[in-house]
């Protein structure tokens, strides 16, 4: 049997990882400035993470949600404490798409309505409702096309026009669009959106799958705007590579048996991984570190990268050029051995390093980028010599 290959694969086989570094089967070292799509939050093979998972596996790795699993409540308590959402409830699942699927389903159950307001450029996953709310027709199958979705720009008047129809169960928004190219709605827009949802009786779902867990310098990116969504989707950095997702649910939304369900969600190992992540975020003060390193990275890029725009917050950064970045990205990997990401906009380079990335590792990336950008753009642009990153 062969794999059903849906990804274009680079010819690299990682066999070891530690912190922000990977090694392939030939012994070549790589710098991870992408974290496997924002998944690696506390660094590869963090000792506390490895210990937590090892100890849990030596006791019990899995049993179904038909029995008492105290580590689930331990995780819920810790997540509420660290995130500032202690009064919310937690439903656990396995991925970001599944989290968004359950968020949308919960909103529809709660309101008795079905229409969803989503935003241009959004990505919420590849399952039924989540992909319907994703602004990419190429990945929406005919089977997924019958959902009632209204895509709008970041325009409060346009949002209100849809809400006035009276059939909207929820608005779902990424506080920072990841796949879309690190696009940020303004804090004022998020505040206005929250007010409109409340006015018209629709739930506000914050998709924090990529932007959450300290990535923006706050635990959740929407906290920069001071809003409190009704439902918050989490995954990716939540497990640092172990499959886990979830939704944080406002106390006004009540649970009933059978409303949502999962076989593997919230298993013992997944909860151990998620607890380890929260413990390391706290113990190593990674929110402050992400803020500090993010500020340093963006200020250096703004001064020296020759870009049209530097986007993002914390360690969720987009670099927009006036030319396609494919060649730069390919050479960062093949010549400088640095993993970075791309976006749906071919001119945007996406950076999502571990939250504990060091200044020396940031400088290594910057020097490689400046060299390649100078070469890539020299035929079309006059450029001054780049400045070395500040030490």
Residues covered by each model-derived region:
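Conserved N-terminal phosphate-binding loop of PLP-dependent enzymes in the Aspartate aminotransferase
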Residues: 1-391
């Amino acid at each position: 049997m062969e794999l059903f290959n849906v990804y274009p694969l680079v010819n690299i086989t990682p066999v070891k990882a530690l912190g922000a570094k990977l090694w392939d089967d030939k012994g070549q070292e790589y710098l991870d400035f992408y974290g496997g799509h924002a998944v690696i939050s506390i660094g590869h093979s963090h000792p506390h993470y490895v210990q937590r998972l090892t100890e849990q596996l030596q006791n019990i790795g899995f049993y179904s949600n038909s029995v008492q699993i105290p580590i689930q409540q331990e995780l819920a308590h810790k997540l509420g404490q660290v995130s500032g959402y202690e009064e919310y409830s937690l439903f656990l699942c396995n991925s970001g798409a599944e989290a968004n699927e359950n968020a949308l389903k919960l909103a529809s159950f709660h309101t008795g309505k079905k229409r969803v307001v989503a935003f241009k450029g959004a990505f919420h996953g590849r399952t039924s409702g989540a992909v319907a709310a994703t602004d990419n027709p190429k990945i929406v199958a005919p089977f997924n096309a019958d959902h009632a979705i209204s895509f709008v720009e970041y325009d409060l008047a346009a949002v209100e026009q849809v809400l006035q129809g009276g059939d909207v169960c929820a608005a779902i928004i990424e506080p920072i669009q990841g796949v879309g190219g690190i696009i940020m709605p303004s804090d004022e827009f998020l505040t206005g959106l929250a007010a409109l949802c409340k006015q018209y009786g629709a739930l506000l779902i914050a998709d924090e799958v990529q932007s959450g867990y300290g990535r923006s310098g706050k635990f959740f990116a929407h906290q920069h705007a001071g809003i409190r969504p009704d439902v918050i989707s989490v995954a990716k950095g939540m497990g640092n590579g172990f499959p886990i997702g979830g939704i944080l649910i406002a106390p006004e939304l009540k649970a009933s048996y059978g409303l949502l369900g999962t076989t593997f969600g919230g298993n013992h190992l997944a909860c151990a991984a998620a607890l380890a992540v929260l413990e390391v975020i706290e113990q190593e003060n990674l929110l402050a570190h992400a803020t500090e390193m993010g500020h340093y990275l963006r200020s250096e890029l703004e001064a020296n990268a020759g870009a049209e725009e530097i986007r993002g917050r914390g360690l969720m950064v987009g670099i927009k050029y006036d030319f396609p970045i494919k060649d730069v990205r390919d050479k960062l990997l093949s010549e400088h051995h640095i993993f970075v990401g791309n976006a749906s906009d071919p001119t945007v380079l996406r950076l999502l390093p571990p939250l504990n990335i060091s200044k020396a590792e940031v400088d290594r990336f910057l020097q490689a980028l400046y060299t390649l950008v100078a070469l890539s753009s020299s035929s079309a642009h006059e450029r001054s010599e780049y400045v070395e990153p500040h030490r």
